[in-house]
Amino acid sequence: LYPLASKRSLGKQVEFNSQSIEVIDLEEFNFNGIDFCFFSAGSKVSDQYAPIAANAGAIVIDNTSRYRYEDDIPLIVPEVNSSVLKNYKNRNIIANPNCSTIQLMVALAPIHVYSPIKKINIATYQSVSGAGRSAVELLNRQLTDVSYPEQNESPLFAHNVIPQIGDIQDNGYTLEEMKLVWETKKILGSDDIKVNATAVRVPVRVGHAEAVTIETETDMNLSLIKDLLSKAPSIQLFDDESYPMSILHGEGTDQVFVGRIRKDLSDKNSINLWIVADNIRKGAALNSIQIAETIIQSDY
């Protein structure tokens, strides 16, 4: 394992497998002989160094948005579309989806395989950790600051709900919302699926939740839906009397939790679901590791 970073991090240590490993300068690193290279340092770093690593023979798994929407680069959730991994050799780069997309795809794919999904309406309740470590530190300070909220302090995470994640685009939707649209279509392999998203930041440290309504081509009864989800990989299904919560199930867990499943009262072909997952683990780090494991096990 070679932990890479900028010169600012030289001399620091990271812990792996009960060992301390010193950080290495990314600019001077030789990627020859490296099997896998994981990029999580932002799109600019991935843009500059991922091709260098890929050209040296490393399989690059990129956790940024830099390569997600390029046609010749696979965008992978292993439980959903691992068969697409065979195309990674086009450029030796694989894209890891956005955190909110990953848990959505894990939950919806079993239904989509049985009866194709025509439309998805989603409202996300995304934790502050999705904005980075400094955002969590700001939330913690705001929660104990007696002078909060100060008028000049932004963002106002504590005791607040913020209906904007990412820059607002020309169509009025935020970048986070459009990521859900673009990535869902690519992962499920259908441009015909209609996706309507609202992404919201909530004062939770870790764990994204999503309220989702889907319309399928056929009328599916609840027993069938629950049976499909209960047999699907990486899903823990909750019964009618209980439901997943971010504070209990969205932190330190590897599964995607699904509950509050019910038929839409206004449309017989529509279903409502509540989906919770750890955005740092399944929403990022774990999914990228699963991609590497799938390549190793499948001998692509």
Task: Annotate each predicted stretch with a short phrase.
Residues 37, 128-300:
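Charged docking surfaces used in two-component/phosphorelay signaling
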Residues 1-157, 192-194, 246, 256-257, ...:
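N-terminal Rossmann-like NAD(P) cofactor-binding subdomain of oxidoreductases
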